[in-house]
């Protein structure tokens, strides 16, 4: 469980921002959204494989030289 201690004379907004940052860093919200609905194991594998292919092609595309624009 994540805890954020509010310091003396610290505004609530600053403490809330620190809390949100720690929640984002540990990936709690993304994990909760992923577990919100049941996903079949085959669907999960298919989604992860598609994401890996997309990352691969994105990496390959970024390594290519840009086309000449003339």
From Swiss-Prot:
The protein's matches in Pfam families, at most eight in alphabetical order, are given as: Ribosomal_S21
**In the UniProt record, which is one GO cellular component term?**
ribosome
Q: What is this protein called?
A: Small ribosomal subunit protein bS21
Q: Which UniProt keywords apply?
A: Ribonucleoprotein, Ribosomal protein
GO MF term list:
structural constituent of ribosome
Protein source organism:
Methylibium petroleiphilum (strain ATCC BAA-1232 / LMG 22953 / PM1)
Q: Which NCBIfam families match?
A: S21p
Gene Ontology BP, a term: translation
Q: Which family does it belong to?
A: Belongs to the bacterial ribosomal protein bS21 family.
Q: Which domain of life is it from?
A: Bacteria
């Amino acid at each position: 469980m994540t805890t954020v201690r509010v310091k003396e004379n610290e505004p609530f907004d600053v403490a809330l921002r620190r809390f949100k940052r720690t929640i984002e860093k540990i990936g709690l919200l993304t994990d909760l959204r992923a577990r919100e609905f049941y996903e079949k194991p085959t669907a999960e594998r298919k989604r992860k494989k598609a994401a890996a292919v997309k990352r691969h092609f994105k990496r390959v595309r970024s390594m290519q030289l840009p086309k000449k624009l003339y």
